[in-house]
Structure formats: structure tokens, C-alpha cells
Amino acid sequence: MTSAQNESQALGDLAARQLANATKTVPQLSTITPRWLLHLLNWVPVEAGIYRVNRVVNPEQVAIKAEAGAGSEEPVPQTYVDYETSPREYTLRSISTLVDIHTRVSDLYSSPHDQIAQQLRLTIETIKERQELELINSPEYGLLAQATGRQTIQTLAGAPTPDDLDALITKVWKTPSFFLTHPLGIAAFGREATYRGVPPPVVSLFGPTQFITWHGIRLPSDKVPVEDGKTKFILVRTGEERQGVVGLFQPGLVGEQAPGLSVRFTGINQSAIATYLVTLYTSLAVLTDDALAVLDDVAVDQFHEYK
């Protein structure tokens, strides 16, 4: 009996598939990252899109006296705490885009996955990725731009060593919260620490996610740039109550989908294309200079030969 006759005796796979339903995933976007900075920052709501940071002028000159001994009659010093007359104000910045969806597509092809919902989901994910990039690299309000000269140090020998990170911790020694660096920076530090016989501990956070740590401070990878084989390590203290770094957002937006994020339907044009405006308002404030420090010119291309 020929193979053709065998095939004709039963329904074939190709024909049978025409009656079967396939399980379909939602669209997968490879540029989505964990965005640890957005998770680890403390977020503060602001009014009218403005956040004013009031600082004390010459804090070391505030005079307080401790009594030297019993019966001392030395005069009590007079003092007052002066404030900056022109404090820095942070204004929320917007990240926006228009999403176009043909009504025919959303009407006919929204099962099992809603086309409008998926278009907006992927757009919002991309906007949040851009938000994190700006929080680190923006020349106006990014972490790297707000680190002062006194809070920026150089590596001892190019590659990031435990001594380098210890020196960075001395700059943000009041309850530091976390490090930020590029994945290549994490790998470079792991090599140097292991080569010196002190491999960095690994802890589990946010479920199964593994983080390299140093002195208990987390090292999540992030959008810190790498240029010419060099990157940076950023150390941050977070929170208003700790005079640290805080993220800023505007609450109560029209069409709010998440803190500081709104989606608004703007209409349908003559080509039957529906348009949605997606906008995120964000910024980042450093309350005191010692809440942020940067290890600069970190080489990520140095390797060791183990014998």
C-alpha cells in the first residue's frame, strides 16, 4: 500500500489544524527590563508639578553648647538656623507619545487579546523604560548630573575593587540604600572581588531575583551608560525622612492609570484611526548632597588569568 493511500485513510495534521484553536501569547517586548530604580525609589506626590527643596545655610555654624562641668556660669551661645533664600525647585517633566489604532483592527481582532489594551500596555512599558533612563542620565535632574564634585571619586586602578566600593560607602555612610551600575560593572566587580578571595554575597529579593551585594547593599543592574569600556557606580540613600533621593510624581491626573501616568482618548480621524495620548510626569530630587555619590571611570574590560 502506498504512502498516499495511507494518508487518505485518516484526517491529516494540516487539515485538522484548521479546526483547532492555538494558544496565543500577548506580544513580547524584549526591551522591557526589571526597572529596579523605579521599584527601589521612594516616590513623593507634588502639587502643581513643583517640588521645592529647602536647605539650611552653613549647617556647621549652628552653635550648641554642652555644659563643661557642675556650676559652670559660662554664657549660653546664641544661634539660629538660616535657610537658603533661593532654594532649588524641581519641575515635573513629561514623557509623552500618541498611540494610533485603526478601529477596524480593534473591532475585528480583539479576541482573545484586546488590541487597544496591548498597544497601550507595550507603549506604557516603553515610556517607563525611558523614565528610568532619564532618572539616571537626564542633564537636568538625573542622578549622574546631580552628583557634586565632592561626592564623585575615581577608582584606584580602573577595575572596581572592594576598596573602591568601600570608599564610595564613606561618601553616603548615613544608611545607604542601594548601588546602581551597568551589568558589565556588576560582572567586573564580581571578578575583582573573587580574585581577591572575597566573593560578594548574593541575596534573593522580589521573589526569585538574585542580587549581588556588598556590605549588605544591593547591586541591581540598570541603565548606567558604558562608554569606551568604562561605566560608573552610583550609591544612593533614599527617602524624605532620611534626607535622601526621592522620585516625584503628580497624583490625580485625568485618565490616571498609574502614579503620574495618564492615558486619554483624543478622538477618531477621517481614516477611522483612534488616537490615545499617553503621558508620564516625573522627576527626581536629591535633598542633600551626601545622599548621592558616584564612582567614576570604572573599567569593565579587565580580566584575570587564574592558575
From Swiss-Prot:
The keyword Glycosyltransferase does not apply. Its main location: other. Keywords: Encapsulin nanocompartment. It holds the Pfam family SrpI-like. It comes from the Bacteria. Has 4 domains; an N-terminal arm not found in the type 1 subfamily, a discontinuous peripheral domain (P), an elongated loop (E) and the discontinuous axial domain (A). Belongs to the encapsulin family. Family 2A subfamily. Dominant antigen for this bacteria, could possibly used in vaccine formulation and/or for diagnosis. Shell component of a type 2A encapsulin nanocompartment. Forms encapsulin nanocompartments about 24 nm in diameter from 60 monomers. Probably encapsulates at least cysteine desulfurase (CyD) and allows passage of cysteine into its interior, probably involved in sulfur metabolism. This is Type 2A encapsulin shell protein. It comes from Mycobacterium avium.
